C-alpha cells in the first residue's frame, strides 16, 4: 500500500492503520496502539510529536507491534529481549 505524503496526525494515522484493527492513542511524550477492545498492543512509542515520523513509518510500527503482540501471546517462551 502506498501513502501519499500527508502530515502525520492522529486522524491520518488512524485512517492508515484501520485495516489492522488498531488505532493510535497519544500520551504525554509517547503514543501507543490499541485494538478495538481498547487493549494496548505492543510497547509505547516515545515521540514528542506524531509528525516526527511519516504515516508509512507509523503503519510499519503498528504492523511490527501487532506481530510482536501475537508472537508473545502464542509463543511467550520464544521472546528474548
Regions picked out by a protein language model, each given a short descriptive name:
Residues 1-21, 53:
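Negatively charged, low-complexity tracts enriched in Asp/Glu with abundant Ser/Thr
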Residues 6-7, 28, 80:
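Small/flexible residues
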Residues 11-16, 27, 42-49:
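Polybasic, low-complexity nucleic-acid-binding and compaction segments
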Residues 27-36:
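Short linear loop/turn motifs
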Residues 35-81:
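Detector for the mature cores of small, proteolytically processed
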Amino acid at each position: 500500500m502506498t501513502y501519499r505524503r500527508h502530515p502525520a496526525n492522529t486522524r491520518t494515522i488512524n485512517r492508515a492503520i484501520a485495516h489492522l484493527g488498531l488505532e493510535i492513542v497519544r500520551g504525554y511524550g509517547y503514543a501507543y496502539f490499541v485494538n478495538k477492545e481498547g487493549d494496548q498492543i505492543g510497547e509505547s512509542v516515545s515521540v514528542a510529536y506524531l509528525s516526527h515520523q511519516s504515516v508509512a513509518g507509523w503503519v510499519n510500527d503498528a504492523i511490527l507491534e501487532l506481530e510482536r503482540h501475537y508472537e508473545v501471546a502464542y509463543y511467550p517462551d520464544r521472546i528474548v529481549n
